[in-house]
Amino acid sequence: MATKGRWSRLWVDDFDMSTKTASAEVSMSIATEEVTAFQATAKEFITTDPESSIKITGYVSNIGNNAGGWEQELHDRFGAANTSQVGLMLADSATGDAGMPTYVLPATSVDEDKISAPASGVLGINGSFMAGDYGLRRGICLWYGSVTGTGNKTSFDIGAAGSAGGDVYVWVFSITGGATNASIKVQSATTSGGSYSDEATVTFSAVGGFTAAMTGAISQWLRVNIASMGGASAISLAVVAAVDGVTQPA
């Protein structure tokens, strides 16, 4: 049975744009160019760099200044430096976020921004985030929601161990009570109930998108550890881990 796209989620830096997005499209392609020259016995081609993007269609639900609406957030990132972190999580249920594949543009900006204003309809918007400086990454969502204290979250089996490191991506949407050096760890173990080792730590004192590298061997079971709330009473965030050679090509 086909899976509904309605449970997908879209994150842009410190904004959860899920309820303002009508559709999203992940695009990946590898082009070739003909390089046939004299003396060639057949046509010759080379493979060029891969290209990728995340395109969105959404609604202009709020046009107030700094209100987190699509109109301003796309415009602010149009042709800007590649500093935005965008993630598209594909989910198969309303609450089953952990373990869901998530496509991440770690350092991107907007290269297309279209607004429609029909007299008899709603304000609509179309935009595209380009590959940016680090291309497209595929990871697994380990946590999405609010945390109110330190401790471990449920572990998840990523299917195999990795040997070439990877990256952790964190989106912090809101902080209640303020935070100073709050920290989130991603840990791994060979079994669900095994001994966990720290693979990466992300520290933050404000909302936004953050990343940290994982190096070397990474075990098959991953979990999020809320190491410090930084003085906050609640933090809303999403955590994604991309393991080279497991969740994406090495």
Language model feature labels by segment:
Residues 65-111:
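Short, acidic/charged, Gly/Pro-enriched secondary-structure junctions
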Residues 197-207:
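Solvent-exposed serine/threonine-rich low-complexity stretches and specific carbohydrate-binding patches
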Residues 154-158, 208-216:
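Exposed aromatic-hydrophobic patches
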Residues 62-65, 173-181, 229-234:
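Extended, low-complexity, turn-rich repeat/linker tracts enriched in Gly/Pro/Ser/Thr and Asp/Glu
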Residues 125-127, 138-140, 230-247:
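Edge beta-strands of jelly-roll/beta-sandwich modules across compartments, strongly enriched
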Residues 1-63, 98-130, 135-139, 144-146, ...:
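Solvent-exposed edge beta-strands and adjacent loop segments
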Residues 183-187, 240:
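Beta-strand signatures of extracellular beta-sandwich domains
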Residues 122, 165-170, 216-238:
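Noncatalytic modules at the cell exterior or secretory-pathway interfaces
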